[in-house]
Design a protein with these regions (language model features):
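Active-site acidic carboxylates
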Residues: 1-108
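Glycine-rich oxoanion-binding loops at beta->alpha junctions
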Residues: 106-107, 112-121
Length: 121
């Protein structure tokens, strides 16, 4: 039986979710340069999806990985956490550099940005 795609993605119960599409993950400032190079081809596609979702009234939600200035809630049980800790020394003021969305995607005023302070995705 064919799936009714229009009903499946109706704006009333659908959202576009991006996860960690941030400068320090897939951008020029990435601590994972191989990942950033591999992601260059998907950034325009994500941006196109986000524009289409907004135009259709579908919420766009950006899940970001962030740290508090005091690093409370931050894990240290993976090598990736040690690498990201160097980006934001304990007590550094202002937003975490990893919280900046990739410039090719960005957040529009109506988008939701949902920070995550611990764990890996």
């Amino acid at each position: 039986m064919p799936v009714d795609l229009a009903a499946l993605v109706a704006p009333g119960h659908t959202a576009l979710l991006t996860v960690e599409v941030q400068d320090n993950v897939i951008g020029d400032a990435s601590i994972l340069p191989d990942l950033a190079r591999a992601a260059t081809t998907i950034v325009p596609n994500i941006a196109t999806l986000a524009r289409a979702a907004r135009a259709a009234g579908v919420p766009v939600v950006h899940g970001t990985a962030e740290t508090r200035p005091d690093r409370l809630g931050s894990n240290n049980n993976a090598r990736l956490f040690a690498a990201t800790a160097k980006l934001r020394p304990r007590g550094a003021p202002g937003p975490a550099p990893t919280a900046v969305l990739h410039a090719g995607i960005g957040a529009e005023p109506g988008d939701l940005v949902m920070p995550r302070l611990h764990g890996l995705s």
